[in-house]
Structure formats: C-alpha cells, structure tokens
Amino acid sequence: MNDTTQPIVRMQQLNKHFGSLHVLNNIDLDIVPGEVVVIIGASGSGKSTLIRCINGLEEFQSGNLVVDSSELLPYGKSTQALQKIRTEVGMVFQQFNLFPHLSVLDNVTLAPMKVRGLSRDDAISSGKRLLDRVGIADQADKYPSHLSGGQQQRVALARALAMEPRLMLFDEPTSALDPEMIGEVLDAMRELAKEGMTMVIVTHEMGFAREVADRVIFIHKGEIAEQGPPEKLFDTPQHERTQSFLARVLKH
Amino acid sequence: MEVTFQFDWSAAFGSIPHLLPGIPWTLLISFGGLAIGFFIGIFFGLLRISPLRWLRWPAIVYVEVFRGTPILVQVLFIFYGLPQLLGSPINALVAGIAAIAVNSGAYISEIVRGGVQSIERGQSEASLSLGLSRTQAFRYVIWPQAFRRMIPALGNQGIISIKDTSLFSVIGVGELVRQGQIYIATTFTALEVYFMVALMYLAITWTLSILLRQLERRGLAGQ
C-alpha cells in the first residue's frame, strides 16, 4: 500500500461515554490524505467530541484509532503517540483560544520554536509568511484582543499551520463569529482545501460544506447515520433523521 | 484628678531616630519570609491542582494547618517549641522569617491555585493541540497569564505579612514595634511613639501599594 491510499485517520468501533451517556457509538471512519470531510449534526450529537478524539483532547473507552500511523489507546494511555499526533494534527477552535499574553506573531511562532526546535529567525520568517497568507501580516505586533473575531480566527489558523500539520481539524470555526466575519474565515479555509490539505470540519455552514467537502457525514446521537458526497447527502438524503435535520437547518 | 490629653510633637519626632533601626528588620523579616513563602505557595498551590489525589492531600493539610492557626502561635512554636525538639536555640530573626514563610505560603498556595484554575481550559487545549507538552503549556501559556491575575492578591498578602511581623516583638526581634516598646520604656510617651510606629508601617505598605499598581498596569498593558 502506498501513502496516498493509506488512511491518515482510521477509526474502528470507537466508543465514548460521559458517565451513563453514550456519546460516540461504534464509530467507523477512514479519512485519506487530501480528503475534506465535513461533519454535520444537531448540537449534542457528538460531532465535536468525535474530532476531539482524533488529537486526543477527548479520551475514548473502546475501539481502535490510528492517526498518521500512531495508535491512540483507550483512556488516553499513550502519551508518546499522543505527543507525536499532536505535532502532525492542527486544530482550530470555536473560541479561537489565542494566547492573549502573546502578540499575534508570538502566537504563531511559539509552537514551531518549542516543539519543532526552529530558530527564532526561521520561526518569525515562516510565521510572517503565514500571517500574510491569511491576510493579517500588518497586525503581527498587536495583541489578539485588539483584533476582530474574524481576524483572531485567521491568526488561529495561521498558528496551527505554522506546525506544518498533515491534517487540520476545525471545531465549529465560525460559530462564535459575527455574521459579517464568517466569510473571511471560510475563504481562508477554502484556500487551504484547494491546496490539498486534509481537513475534518465540524460546521453549521451548509453552503460551505456543499462547496468544499469531498464527503459529508451526518451524525445523530453518537452514530454515523449517513454519509456521502455533498450533492447526494444534501439533495437526496436517505435517512429520515438526515431529512428532518436538513429540513430544519436549510429552512433559513 | 485632672487628665489632659496632649500630643507632644517633639516627643513624636524625637522618637524617629530610635525607631528607624527597626525598619530594616521589619523589611528583612517580611520580604525574606515572603520570598520563601512565594516558592512554598507555588509548590503547594500546584500540588493542590494535581490530578493525583496523593499529591493533593499534603497540600490540603498544609493549607488547613497554617491558615487555620494564628501566626503568633506559629512563631512562638518555632522560637520556643522547636528548640526543645532540636536541642539548640533558634535565632529570633530566623524564627520570624520562617513564620512569615510558612504562614504566607499557605495563603499564597491558595492564590496560585485560584490563579491557575481561572485560566480557561481552551488555553491548555490549544497549547496541547499544537504539540506542546503539559509542562511547556504550563510554562509558556498558563503560568504567565495566571501570574498576572495573581498580582493583586499577592500584593494583598504582602501587605498583610508586613503587618504580621509586628507580632514578632514578642520573641524579641528588633523590628519596628519592638524598637518602639524599648523606647517607650524609658520615655513613657506611648501615644506619640505608637503613632510614629503606625506611620512607618503606613509608609512601607503605601510604597508597596504604589509599586503594585504600576506593576499591574504594566502587566495589563500587554493585553
């Protein structure tokens, strides 16, 4: 098997419980390099939990999970694999989670310097290039609180990309944004998808999902209820749950 | 019998040269004790938020014991009690510094715990997602933010500890109150001398307040 067909994420029979709540129920999911997967579903359906398992921010209780050929074990028992996976998998959060005590540029250069061991000069020059790419080069010396939400989220994207990840996770990246700022963040993500980045995106932006996704997954009560190419899933949903969910979210 | 209340300014001013030698002692005990207490506080404060129960409980016991007993009892225990155990006397200055250290350490560990716990979970999640280890996340992301939030409470504790050193006159260390007592024993001008003693404490604590306000303003300017 060569590298292009080998999945970068392989999830088999994954189960997660929060106490008595069964959050993820026997999830099987393979993601191949270059693929853009969008996960949709009602709030509380487990879609955020699912992608947070991929970089070990959430533990699972049973099943197999291999990310970039490192295996994550149930109950978070695999610190070394976890560390390795996290250096190769980037994440963008709903609340941006920028470091407020560091300048925009320092936000972007911190991990490459401390984790990848880049020199300060190298980290700064690649950091500036990334900030330029997401259109915030002129804000490099400001602190995050001086930026708009859309700008902050683009910095967060640049910060994740600075680690040169092989896979990017997006956990509702536009849900905390004012409507007029959603576009600029989606544009940056669209750009990234075009360049061939492997992406797993949890979002409520159905138009964006239809346009960018190679595959859309609908999650209902911790199970993958339905998945397929966007045209198929959005235009001719098979599962009754998918139909009623789409009817609700596409109405407005 | 007629009683007249007369504040004698010349007695007040005259006491100053006799009180001044107490200031270095007061400063030495308070800042020496606070410096050690700061590290004790960081140590137990971090133990207190460890995920491991057997690391948490020593911190809980430490805080309960030294926050729950009077500092006067603590210094008497150290100065008069411990020598019986050790078989050799303890220097009054050392006993004073130790009492401030263990006492402020208990309060500071609670300040540290609160400061670190006040940082949103998203900060450590973002750090970990970038591949930073837990230690790196703490050192570069969590601690610098937590420390800024701790500054007002630490300043408060500093001022309290400076005033607590006045109790150590009972073990004979030559701090401000002790110098006042010695002087009053010969002049009987308690009103004027204690007034000046109070002013000197105020001068120290007020200076500290001003420095802290500047530190806070500078710390916040970054954000």
Q: Language model features by range: what are they?
A:
Chain A
Residues N2-D3, T242:
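Pre-NBD coupling/linker segments of ABC/ABC-like ATPases
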Residues H220, Q227, E231-H252:
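C-terminal boundary and immediately downstream tail of ABC-type ATPase nucleotide-binding domains
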Residues Q6-P230:
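ABC family nucleotide-binding domain
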